[in-house]
Amino acid sequence: MGKLRSIALAYMVGLFLVASLNYIPGLTDSEGRAFGVFALDIYDDALHVASGLWAGIAAMTSRRAARIFLFGFGLLYLTDGLLGLAAGSGYLDLGIINHGVLDLPLTFKILANLPHIGAGAFGVYASYRHKAEAA
C-alpha cells in the first residue's frame, strides 16, 4: 500500500475516532468537554467526519492523492490550530465566526489546539518526507 496511503488511512481512523468522542459515555465532563478540554459540537463532528472521508478516499485512490490530502489537510489544520492558539477560536469549525476571539488561559489554548497543530504539522511533514513515493 505504501507509506503515504497508510498514513492517510491512519488519519481516517483517527478522525473518525475523534468524531465519535461525544457519543462514548464517560469521556465528556458535565460541561460537555471531551477529556475536560475539547468542547466538541456538531460543527467539529462534521469537520472530522468530512476530513476522515477525504483521508479515506485519498488513501484508497492513489499515492499521489494521499500526498495531496496530507499536504492540504496539514496546511488547513496547522493554520487552524495556530489561529486557535492566537485567538482562542479556529476557522475550520466556524469557531471564530460563532464565538469570536476568546480570552482563554494560554495553557488551555495550547492543550485545546495541540491536536490540530500536531496533526497538521505531521501531515505536511509526511507529504514532504515521502514525496518520492508519489512521483
Model segments located where?
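Membrane-interface extramembranous regions
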Residues: 1-135
